[in-house]
Amino acid sequence: MNVHLQPNMLIPRSAAQTARAVVMVPPKEFGFNAQTAQDNAFQNPLALSAETILQRAMAEFNAMVNGLRQAGVDVVIFDYPLDQGETPDAVFPNNWFSTTEAGELFLFPMACANRRLEVRPEALIKTLQQQGFAVKKQHSLLAFTEQQAFLESTGVMVMDHPNRTIYAGLSQRCDREVLEVYAEQIGYSRVVSFQTRLPSGSPIYHTNVMMAIGEHFCVICDEAIPEYERRFVVKSLAKDKQVISISIEQMNRFCGNILQLETADGQKVIAMSQSAYEAFTLTQLNQLATHGKLLPFAVPTIETIGGGSVRCMLAELFFPKQA
């Protein structure tokens, strides 16, 4: 367990937990990524043709975009030319950038070479500006790649924005030094980093498959945290959140990979996969429903082959809209 308090920080100020807009990237080159499979135990190949996989992934993506928009969430589709080498995981944009309410764009170092090809900040900024978002400043942590030190954005960091706190499970994709550098840059006063362990003994590749934080709730697979750290993490979350504990089996169905969002009229919704929805107990679904309308999306192809689910497909946009 490591709790790092940033020095000389102001008292945490209010910040929105839920974004009203998200970036989504179409899975135009989607397929099994052998590079990421080295430490992502959630990936599994399917005995389907590449063409069938692409068709199914695109259909799942389009249905999710339409469902979010119908619910009132602003979805920005970031398309890109097929000119920089294959990017089979581009559908998971939340791993290479994050945004703030102050209009700041942060770029993050990713562990796998073919995932670094996804990083297209100029094209992203152009797309966002065309959609009326004010991008005021860019910060890059990409230089850490040369040191083999990685921090895969909101894949490895689960943010409690109002409390200026970052929760992070340490792994090959979450380096403690880079984590603390980012926390200092963003002005977050508290970093709670911890170990995780699958039944195989390996760490969980991304924190956001085992936990999610909403405005007044959190979902966490606390049994994946060693006992000597578990109590502290749960106690920290429980200070002002309803804690919903999920099992390893539920985590494997992506119950931790969910995201609370806000609609244009200020209503809360919770995006999740159909697999996760079916794996939650009725009691848990009722608990979640008190925090927002549940939006389950069927993304079985993307989940199985990509090893990531609905939350991984959503990069939150906290940028202000231009007047």
Q: Residue locations for each model-derived region?
A:
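The feature marks the mature, well-folded catalytic cores of soluble enzymes
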Residues: M1-A323
